[in-house]
Swiss-Prot record:
Keyword vocabulary terms for this entry: Cytoplasm, Lyase, Schiff base
Xref: HAMAP family: DeoC_type1
Protein name, as recorded: Deoxyribose-phosphate aldolase
Compartment(s): Cytoplasm
Class of this enzyme: lyase
Family listed: Belongs to the DeoC/FbaB aldolase family. DeoC type 1 subfamily.
GO molecular function: deoxyribose-phosphate aldolase activity
Length: 223
């Protein structure tokens, strides 16, 4: 697989709590230069970033991030605000307390409400696979499919682990037609990126692939 084809799947990501505007600018510049799928950045930078790229790059942001246990009303507001500010794509975190209580109907209803606000904007649903049993992940594949979301996403990158090959294999087997897969967190090599794509992921959330391409790969515990 050619590097340019891998880059087309990448949501070039910077979600560090201390991210500065010059750092965000670098993410945006690199994403445009290497023609990634989007740049994924904190919501507080969306308006400025959208103005900066002026339609040359899709802007992705996160809501309910990273813990997911804010109320549905709060997430709906975050979604509306992000889109109003110029976000093209929304990555939302589900409420894992609902999952652990077995209340999958509430999870599905929340996703439906947010998808309704997204309208034609892309919605990706972060399920935080490292916190799930295999049975819970399988159930959530059905929930995300029924909710009308565009993607199911493995991880925030802020929990105990990121994407694994095994989890993406499960998603590819159980998610419904029309729902795509985003692998995120800990993707640190072109080889891993290519494997995730081969297993069924059509998006990759990472900050490292461009660094590798630029021969600037560094070892880090961040997203």
């Amino acid at each position: 697989m050619e590097v340019k084809d891998i880059l087309k799947t990448v949501d070039h990501t910077l979600l560090a709590t201390t991210a500065t505007w010059p750092e965000i600018q670098t993410i945006l510049d690199d994403a445009m230069a290497y023609e990634t799928a989007s740049a994924c950045i904190p919501a507080s930078y969306v308006k400025k970033a959208a103005e900066y790229v002026s339609g040359k790059l899709a802007i992705c942001t996160v809501i309910g991030f990273p813990n997911g246990y804010s109320t549905t009303a709060a997430k709906v507001f975050e979604c509306e605000d992000a889109i109003q500010n110029g976000a093209d794509e929304i990555d939302m975190v589900i409420n894992l307390t609902d999952v652990k209580n077995g209340d999958f109907d509430t999870v599905e209803e929340e996703i439906r409400q947010i998808k309704a606000k997204c309208q034609d904007h892309i919605l990706k649903v972060i399920v935080e696979t490292c916190q799930l049993t295999k049975e819970e992940l399988i159930e959530l594949c059905g929930v995300v499919t029924r909710s009308g979301a565009d993607f199911i996403k493995t991880s925030t990158g802020f929990s105990t682990a990121g994407a694994t090959f095994e989890d993406v294999e499960v998603m590819a087997k159980y998610v419904g037609e029309g729902v795509k897969i985003k692998a995120a967190g800990g993707i640190s090599s072109l080889e891993d990126a290519e494997t995730f794509i081969a297993l069924g992921a059509s998006r990759l959330g990472t900050s490292r692939i461009i660094k590798i391409v630029k021969n600037e790969a560094i070892k880090t515990d961040s997203y």
